[in-house]
């Protein structure tokens, strides 16, 4: 059943948390902080030198072959080509047990993973919304409100609670069978949307080589009519192959991403076991994009449908390759993954899929040197894509492979833009709408790692860290000639950056001693960015006795309302505490509410009218925003 999977997801979340929550003495220089905000099923990430050379050249191009071909998004000719690709890759992995390939598939929670350009305020201003990564792009979460009710998700049970100026009453709940695990919910226009993973056992010990067979995960979506919130009614559903990754909602259309790892077995004997399905039907070959590199055994699947007709897909695409960091702008979906070539240099593969009114179109794909920290390290603005990466391993001269170009032009771009990049540094790239490099800066912050980033219009900010926290500011007004404007060095580091009104940038991270070895607690920083060339730390505040927070990998857990001058999040002390702060330029940070929680099951803060609601697991508490005195509570 799905119990094992749920425990694995919870354990994975704890593992992430431990990486972030240092206590007392920590060897900072050895810390490698990589925050991934999307839940993903991780497939083959790495290969040893020369491994891909033994693959069928007509099926998967080697690194050398890639230099001689353009890298447009190419669809499969037919199912035979896809099957051959998967079988060749699986044979290669079986032949080389000493390969650097990592895992078959390990699940990561879609706390979704990671990040927010916008404030989480509704259009009316009467209630708050989830902290979003991109303005205008809706995201599902574990808590939602429509201003009249609060919708909560806890242990796969969705509960609808009516609110009335701080008073609360449970109206209804939606429960699932043991094989279904709900991971996200969304509310819009009297519709409640549930996203989750359905696990089915395939085979048993009598007719399968595997003991008790194996579990096949499918992503499922259920849409309910909540015009009568006390009696929600299911009006449609969608199902697709693979475990749930993430989702977005734009202009009434839902876009669902899942990770599918085909498994050939002798039980089901399904002829097209290697082809993903949507609503029980195989995705057509012309809608399946072939591997960009030697990643021929896993898919990222995208399905679109309208909330008005949730059982009928409007489009679907399958892209070979897993999704490490997924970023969705107002017009495009960017699927990225880490990749290690023959040279053992880390790279990021990028695939671009445009979307509009439920239709999906493959645009381009490329690769850049280095790895993304999270979805804030990648941002689309005025048709260009800006990224900051950390360069690992040794240098290779085939850094960028722009799309739709000849090998000669590609190599010229590499020579002009990447030749000075060295390992152990960081880079900034600007790519055009075809994912061709048009601007770059290299060799930033030697021996440091990017911990957070925020792009704000024509200016970008990013934090690197080893022993001190340099906050870099970058002028991006000329995309072809980005320039470093300034560099502020202070102890500690910021894991999360958020715009906080005109000329202000909020940072949340850790305060660390100047020697870089002793943590002092969770640190709040307010940066004055009025002059990007002369950024200053206007005020700072250390939460004593705290040793961590999850804001670096779970941006949805951060409540920020600039107009109300409030922000809150969970910190870890001897227990778990939700803390709410306000800010004044003269007086600095001030704690206005602190509530110790009984455990960590996902906590969110939100407001409706003049009441602040704190949700933790199956508990909701209400507080007056005039003094933050408790008004009511309910256990669901």
Describe each model-derived feature in a short phrase.
Residues 25-26, 39, 409, 503:
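Generic signature of intrinsically disordered, low-complexity, basic-rich segments
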Residues 1-6, 26-53:
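Single-pass transmembrane signal-anchor helices and their membrane-water interface zones
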Residues 47-636:
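Beta-sheet-rich non-transmembrane sensory/scaffold domains
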Residues 24-25, 155:
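Extended, solvent-exposed functional surface patches
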Residues 1-20:
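Disordered, charged N-terminal biogenesis/targeting segments of membrane/secreted proteins
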């Amino acid at each position: 059943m799905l119990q094992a999977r749920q425990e694995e997801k919870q354990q994975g979340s704890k593992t992430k948390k431990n990486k972030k929550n240092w206590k007392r003495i920590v060897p900072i220089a050895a810390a490698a902080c990589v925050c991934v905000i999307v839940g993903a099923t991780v497939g083959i990430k790495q290969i040893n030198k020369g491994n891909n050379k033994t693959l069928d050249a007509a099926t998967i191009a080697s690194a050398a072959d890639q230099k001689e071909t353009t890298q447009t998004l190419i669809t499969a000719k037919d199912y035979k080509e896809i099957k051959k690709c998967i079988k060749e890759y699986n044979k290669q992995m079986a032949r080389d047990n000493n390969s650097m390939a990592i895992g078959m598939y390990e699940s990561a929670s879609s706390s979704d993973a990671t990040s927010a350009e916008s404030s989480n305020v509704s259009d009316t201003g009467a209630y708050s919304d989830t902290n979003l990564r991109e303005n205008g792009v809706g995201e599902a979460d574990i808590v939602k409100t429509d201003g009249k009710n609060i919708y909560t998700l806890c242990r796969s049970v969705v509960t609808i609670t009516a609110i009335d100026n701080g008073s609360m009453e449970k109206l209804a709940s939606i429960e699932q069978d043991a094989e279904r695990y709900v991971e996200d919910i969304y509310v819009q226009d009297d519709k409640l949307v549930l996203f989750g993973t359905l696990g089915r056992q395939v085979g048993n010990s009598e007719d399968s080589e595997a003991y008790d067979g194996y579990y096949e995960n499918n992503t499922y979506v259920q849409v309910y009519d909540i015009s009568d919130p006390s009696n929600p009614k299911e009006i449609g559903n969608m199902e697709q192959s693979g475990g749930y990754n993430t989702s977005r909602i734009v202009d009434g259309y839902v876009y669902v991403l899942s990770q599918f790892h085909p498994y050939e077995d002798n039980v089901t004997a399904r002829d097209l076991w290697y082809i993903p399905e949507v609503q029980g039907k195989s995705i057509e070959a012309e809608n399946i994009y072939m591997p960009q590199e030697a990643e021929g055994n896993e898919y990222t699947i995208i399905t679109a449908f309208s909330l008005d007709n949730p059982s009928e897909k409007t489009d679907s695409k399958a892209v070979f390759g897993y999704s490490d960091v997924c970023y969705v702008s107002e017009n495009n979906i960017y699927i990225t993954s880490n990749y290690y070539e023959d040279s053992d240099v880390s790279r990021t593969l990028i695939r671009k899929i445009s979307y509009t009114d439920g239709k999906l179109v493959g645009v381009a794909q490329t690769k850049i040197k280095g790895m993304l920290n999270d979805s804030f390290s990648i941002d689309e603005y005025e048709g260009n894509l800006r990224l900051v990466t950390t360069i690992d391993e040794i240098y290779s001269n085939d850094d960028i492979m722009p799309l739709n170009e000849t090998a000669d032009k590609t190599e010229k771009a590499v020579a002009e833009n990447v030749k000075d990049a060295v390992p152990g540094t960081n880079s900034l790239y600007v790519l055009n709408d075809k994912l061709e490099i048009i601007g770059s800066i290299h060799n930033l912050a030697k021996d440091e790692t990017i911990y957070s980033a925020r792009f704000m219009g024509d200016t970008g900010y990013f934090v690197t860290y080893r022993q001190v926290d340099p906050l870099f500011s970058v002028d991006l007004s000329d995309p072809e000639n980005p320039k470093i404007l300034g560099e502020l060095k202070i102890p500690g580091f910021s894991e999360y950056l958020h715009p906080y009104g005109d000329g202000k940038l909020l940072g949340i991270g850790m305060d660390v001693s100047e020697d870089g070895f002793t943590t002092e607690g969770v640190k709040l920083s307010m940066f004055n960015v009025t002059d990007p060339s002369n950024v200053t730390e206007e005020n700072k505040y250390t939460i004593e006795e705290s040793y961590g927070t999850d804001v670096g990998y779970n941006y949805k857990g951060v409540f920020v309302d600039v107009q109300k001058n409030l922000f809150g999040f969970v910190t870890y002390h001897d227990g778990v505490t939700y803390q709410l702060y306000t800010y004044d330029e003269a007086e600095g940070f001030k704690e206005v509410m602190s509530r110790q929680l009984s455990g960590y099951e996902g906590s969110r803060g939100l407001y409706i009218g003049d009441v602040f609601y704190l949700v933790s697991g199956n508990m909701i508490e209400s507080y007056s925003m005039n003094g933050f005195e408790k008004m009511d509570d309910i256990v669901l």
